[in-house]
């Protein structure tokens, strides 16, 4: 793979990259979806309050087209009449139509931009770069946005033209209908016009959802080197991690070896395995493993045992099973009670021999070890 190919952003963004993107304010923003929701809530509000809207419209028309000579003779009356029309009717009408839409816009803004970042309001000299501006103008995203905008404008214009030519003109220029009928008819026609536009926008918005999601993840794609560097930064350099594991393992081993001197017996396979066991019948319900190791660690355990005159028992099978079936700091499993009991009985005989003297206790050679434990031990070694 050549250098150019290795630098291509072909990898999906990691969870850390997505988190950083959210913190810096680069979120998915479904502009078309929020436009649809605002239009929907406005349309529902319009239909729900249509009686009140009609009443306010009638009052506005009545006050506007009613001639009262006394009003025009006094400027104060004229101003008062205008304010009355504006305050009592027009503001109420605008509030009914637009206030629910404004209320709905704030949750939409909060949902899409839950993290407010003031970095975007800082001055950036790169924004004045004409080359970058030219690239943004002719980017795929800009072309798609332009296409969607043109498509919406064309359709809305066609729908509005058809509704005006088919419904409004024949009613507005006819003298056979009353004013109330024309007003009611106009409100219903406006509602149907907006509903038609809303229905048409649905497939556009569904396509836009998939496009915005694809474009968002595409903009966050990473090169393989970026993914590798990010993993190193998050999890650490593999060499450093290996060194840390070695240090932790060394500390754990030193702590474990410090407990060998407290053990009652060490079971060994002469060359490879060593397991230190302790049992205190007053505060232990079973023998406990204080230390275990193989190769160099086993040699250290045996050396510490010799320095502290701890009895050492050689048993190939028992050493293997104890090493693979137990953990340091834990009690031995119940299936090994009988075998370990023989070892501890031998240890107690040695202690008695040291006090009373006599013949040195015979070292046990055969131990009861369930066959399934021995088979598991062989498989684990393999």
Swiss-Prot record:
Compartments it resides in: Cell membrane
UniProt keyword Transmembrane helix, yes or no: yes
InterPro entries listed in its UniProt record: T3SS_substrate_exporter, T3SS_substrate_exporter_C
Transmembrane segments: 33-55, 90-112, 150-169, 189-211
Any Gene Ontology CC annotation: plasma membrane
Keyword presence, RNA-binding: no
Record protein name field: Flagellar biosynthetic protein FlhB
Organism: Buchnera aphidicola subsp. Baizongia pistaciae (strain Bp)
């Amino acid at each position: 793979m050549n250098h150019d190919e290795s630098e291509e952003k072909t990898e999906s963004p990691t969870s850390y990259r997505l988190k950083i993107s959210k913190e810096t304010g680069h979120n998915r923003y479904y502009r078309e979806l929020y436009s649809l929701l605002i239009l929907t809530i406005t349309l529902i509000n319009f239909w729900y309050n249509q009686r009140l809207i009609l009443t306010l419209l009638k009052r506005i028309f009545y006050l506007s087209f009613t001639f009262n000579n006394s009003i025009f003779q006094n400027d104060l009356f004229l101003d008062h009449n205008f304010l009355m029309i504006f305050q009592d009717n027009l503001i109420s009408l605008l509030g009914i139509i637009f206030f629910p839409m404004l209320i709905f816009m704030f949750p939409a803004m909060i949902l899409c931009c839950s993290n407010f970042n003031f970095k975007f309001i800082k001055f950036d000299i790169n924004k004045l770069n004409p080359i970058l501006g030219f690239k943004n103008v002719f980017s795929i995203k800009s072309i798609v946005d332009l296409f969607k905008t043109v498509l919406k404008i064309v359709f809305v214009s066609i729908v509005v033209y058809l509704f005006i030519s088919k419904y409004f003109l024949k009613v507005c220029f006819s003298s056979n209908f009353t004013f109330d009928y024309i007003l009611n008819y106009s409100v219903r026609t406006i509602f149907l016009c907006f509903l038609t536009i809303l229905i048409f926008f649905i497939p556009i918005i569904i396509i836009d959802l998939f496009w915005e999601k694809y474009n968002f993840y595409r903009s966050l794609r990473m090169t393989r080197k970026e993914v590798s560097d990010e993993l190193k930064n998050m999890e650490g350099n593999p060499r450093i991690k290996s060194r840390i594991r070695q240090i932790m393992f060394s500390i754990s081993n030193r702590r474990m070896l410090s407990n060998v001197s407290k053990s009652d017996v060490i079971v060994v396979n002469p060359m490879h395995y060593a397991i230190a066991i302790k049992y205190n019948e007053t505060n232990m319900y079973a023998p406990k493993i204080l230390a275990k190791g193989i190769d160099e660690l086993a040699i250290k355990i045996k050396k510490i045992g010799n320095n502290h005159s701890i009895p050492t028992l050689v048993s190939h099978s028992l050493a293997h099973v104890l090493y693979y079936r137990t953990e340091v700091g834990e009690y031995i499993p119940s299936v090994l009670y009988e075998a370990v009991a023989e070892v501890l009985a031998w240890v107690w005989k040695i202690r008695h021999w040291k006090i009373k003297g006599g013949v040195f206790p015979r070292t046990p050679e055969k131990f009861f070890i369930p066959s399934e434990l021995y088979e598991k031990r062989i498989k684990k070694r393999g």
